[in-house]
Amino acid sequence: MTDTAPQNDPTTSHVLPKGIRFAGVAAGIKASGKPDVSLIVTDRPSVMAGVYTTNQIVAAPVVLTRAKTPTSTGRVVLTNSGNANACTGDEGMQNAKTMCDLAAKLADCDSADVMVMSTGVIGKPLPMEKVRAGIEAAAGKLGDAESDFIASADAICTTDQFRKTVSETVTIRGQQFRIAAMCKGAGMIAPNMATMLGVVMTDAPIGPDAAQASLKQIAGRTFNRVSVDGHTSTNDTVMLVCTGMSVSEDAKEFNSDELKIWQEAATQVALKLAKMLVADGEGAARFFEVRVSGAADDGDAFVIAKTVAASPLVKTAITGGDPNWGRIVSAAGYAGPKIEPERTSLVIDGVTVFENGTPLSIDAAKLSESMKANSEVLADLTVGDGPGKASFWASDLTEAYVRFNSLYTT
């Protein structure tokens, strides 16, 4: 996807949390020769939390890392790209454990303090000699410069057309705390959790239970509200790393009010990344936002918005710049939650096309031209007079997506 607002700006500088070093190297796991081993290492034991795929087919690194979080002694987040290490049996689990052991030795910590993530093709054994060499090479390049952060972010990518990184600062207790994040993903994006890998990092003082609860809420408002193709991966993982190194080791953790301020800032960081996932959707031409209001509650609104955004007929209409409002309204009708047809209205890119259950006379050709001329389409759907509201973001569905994914493993 090109010329889309949510894309990353390569000229943007990043403010990085204190106490974290980064590296990314090419180990030959990918046939392309692009970077494929990423290391993130904290200078001291740190809080780490995670949210993971809801797929019942779960990759070995997810099984291993999920059992370790939340923790207050985390030191390493190790990622390989180019191979998912999923559906690889006992060998895959042993390989994931070996990766942790190798990183632990190089970081001088326990294997239990290493979190591992993998992404790529499913069902192929990891080339462990290459993985081993990559981990050793990455350990030798660890640094805290922005270039090191970028190298680490590049190494987690697979079919991504651009890296996805964001950073922000938030002032709490009269001092600045830093939040930096990276993620990857362009296909198999239908998270709940997400089809993607991501790491959110901060130097704020947050305990393990608070970190886990915060990350779950952050993901629920961001990564769980995007879709490219409706396919949930076996490897989805988002990690939260909290070093606490903006304050002294004996400083108190954030209280509930302070945590809310930090969480809102982190949510905005994650939302920017989530929108980048959609903007970089495989073969995508347009970024599509569905806003639902008037539902019985936010949960119902979310289900309706997600159903509309996931509909292949809606997606293809967006691709063609076709203001086919009937597809959107009918998708809302089969979503499940109760709607009020006589109070249902739809606005596409500022043009009301359906109001209180009745279609309006519009210049469809003009609206189509507007949709085709823009890379973003907004649908505002009212389904009643209830308090529930939600947004969901998706990409369209193009011939390029079909062509790319029909040849992915061959």
From Swiss-Prot:
Catalytic activity, EC: 2.3.1.35, 2.3.1.1
Signal peptide residues on this chain, from the entry's feature table: none
InterPro entries assigned to the protein according to its UniProt record, in alphabetical order: Arg_biosynth_ArgJ, ArgJ-like_dom_sf, ArgJ_beta_C
Gene3D superfamilies assigned: ArgJ beta chain, C-terminal domain, L-amino peptidase D-ALA esterase/amidase
Subcellular localization, as worded in the UniProt entry: Cytoplasm
Binding site for substrate: T158, K184, T195, E282, N405, T410
Active-site residues annotated for this sequence: T195 (nucleophile)
Keyword Ribonucleoprotein: no
GO cellular component: cytoplasm
CDD domains registered for this protein in UniProt: OAT
Chain's role: Catalyzes two activities which are involved in the cyclic version of arginine biosynthesis: the synthesis of N-acetylglutamate from glutamate and acetyl-CoA as the acetyl donor, and of ornithine by transacetylation between N(2)-acetylornithine and glutamate.
Protein's recorded name: Arginine biosynthesis bifunctional protein ArgJ
Source organism per UniProt: Rhodopirellula baltica (strain DSM 10527 / NCIMB 13988 / SH1)
